Amino acid sequence: VLDGTELPQYKGDVKTMSGYYTDPVNGSKSFTFSGAEVDVQGTSSQYYARKNYKIKFKGGFVDPSGNTQETYKLRPDSVPTNTFTFKADVASSEGANNVELARLYEDTCPFRTAPQKQDSRIRQGIDGFPIVVFWYDGENTSFIGKYNFNFDKATPEVFGFAEGDESWEIL
């Protein structure tokens, strides 16, 4: 649940929000948060009615025991980070299959990057899992949609980026 008076409407329209994530399978993975910077993610997809949200959890993650962590692990074998994307996958019908295909590739690809040879948790492809997102505006709670809770593509620690590396997006 994203908690704030309004959601970001376009890339660069950053909102500071609080909220919570409830893991329906493993309650210990649930968390609350405050002071998160929420922005629209995606250059072309920012114009869709259903937005992708890049979230920088600046205030950390408060676990069910009340402990605050600066980073969060999507899975037990993941690299912890504090920036994630809630991806709507509006333009494609694959939805969570995008993530599952990337996981299959990750598991079967015989080629490893130099960072992966040093740390097997480093990824070449995206990872995440399906969630539903709601927005609480201070008065009402609205269903936003089915999303994927993904690593953000610009998290250097997840993908093994190093100082001087460049990442290009061709449109």
Language-model-detected regions and their locations in the chain:
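Phosphate/dinucleotide-binding and metal-coordinating scaffold of catalytic cores
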Residues: 1-171
